[in-house]
Amino acid sequence: MTNIRKSHPLIKIVNDAFIDLPAPSNISSWWNFGSLLGICLAVQILTGLFLAMHYTSDTATAFNSVTHICRDVNYGWLLRYLHANGASMFFICLYLHIGRGLYYGSYTYTETWNVGVILLFAVMATAFMGYVLPWGQMSSWGATVITNLLSAIPYMGTDLVGWIWGGFSVDKATLT
């Protein structure tokens, strides 16, 4: 008589994914960070979406909207802290994921490694845009500091900063 977990069509899917998973015997917790990255990204998207529903970017009301989120929105304080700390956890998991790849020699798979490098650059660009696009209290300062790092590039750095900003500097606390 055959085992039901290997013969039933629906249970077989669960069996193949969880019980008889073809994984090496020396797999460790270092291999969890890809999944943790996905969870952190989902948390960031969801909390950012809910925070954006209550945030206003006007210079006069930006701070008050953050106060409104923390005090008046149900679990708004939790959304704010999950979003802020989730970003840190995302990058910790990202760097540990890269470190695991370096430790185990995953860079020898050049196509896969190059896709990962491109994804890293895309994550960095997205993080920068996520920091600048809400156009909130510290965004102008953060964007100025980050983009002024480009001015360290010889010959063309100052032109790059001017090109990104459409001018050399921004004049308000928020970017509206």
Curated annotation (Swiss-Prot):
A GO cellular-component term linked to this record:
mitochondrial inner membrane
Q: How does it sit in the membrane?
A: Multi-pass membrane protein
GO molecular function terms noted in the UniProt entry:
metal ion binding; ubiquinol-cytochrome-c reductase activity
Please name every pair of cysteines joined by a disulfide bond in this record.
Answer: none
This protein's source sits in the domain of life called: Eukaryota
Q: Which InterPro entries match?
A: Cyt_b/b6_N, Cytb/b6-like_sf, Cytochrome_b_N_euk/bac, Di-haem_cyt_TM
Q: Which UniProt keywords apply?
A: Electron transport, Heme, Iron, Membrane, Metal-binding, Mitochondrion, Mitochondrion inner membrane, Respiratory chain, Transmembrane, Transmembrane helix, Transport, Ubiquinone
> Per the record's keyword annotation, is Cell membrane included, yes or no?
no
Q: Which Pfam families is this protein grouped with? A: Cytochrome_B
> Binding of heme b b566: at which residues?
H97
The UniProt entry lists the main location of this chain as: mitochondrion
Q: Which Gene3D superfamilies match?
A: Cytochrome Bc1 Complex, Chain C
Q: Name one GO biological process term.
A: mitochondrial electron transport, ubiquinol to cytochrome c
Residues given in the record as heme b b562 binding sites: H83
Q: Where are the transmembrane segments?
A: 33-53, 77-98, 113-133
The Swiss-Prot or TrEMBL record lists the needed cofactor(s) as: heme b
Cellular localization per UniProt: Mitochondrion inner membrane
Q: How is the cofactor bound?
A: Binds 2 heme b groups non-covalently.
Instruction: Quote the function comment for this protein.
Output: Component of the ubiquinol-cytochrome c reductase complex (complex III or cytochrome b-c1 complex) that is part of the mitochondrial respiratory chain. The b-c1 complex mediates electron transfer from ubiquinol to cytochrome c. Contributes to the generation of a proton gradient across the mitochondrial membrane that is then used for ATP synthesis.
Per UniProt, subunit arrangement is: The cytochrome bc1 complex contains 11 subunits: 3 respiratory subunits (MT-CYB, CYC1 and UQCRFS1), 2 core proteins (UQCRC1 and UQCRC2) and 6 low-molecular weight proteins (UQCRH/QCR6, UQCRB/QCR7, UQCRQ/QCR8, UQCR10/QCR9, UQCR11/QCR10 and a cleavage product of UQCRFS1). This cytochrome bc1 complex then forms a dimer.
* Family, per entry: Belongs to the cytochrome b family.
What more does the record tell us? Heme 1 (or BL or b562) is low-potential and absorbs at about 562 nm, and heme 2 (or BH or b566) is high-potential and absorbs at about 566 nm.
Report the PANTHER family cross-referenced here: CYTOCHROME B
- Name the UniProt record assigns to this protein: Cytochrome b
Q: Which organism is it from?
A: Eumops glaucinus
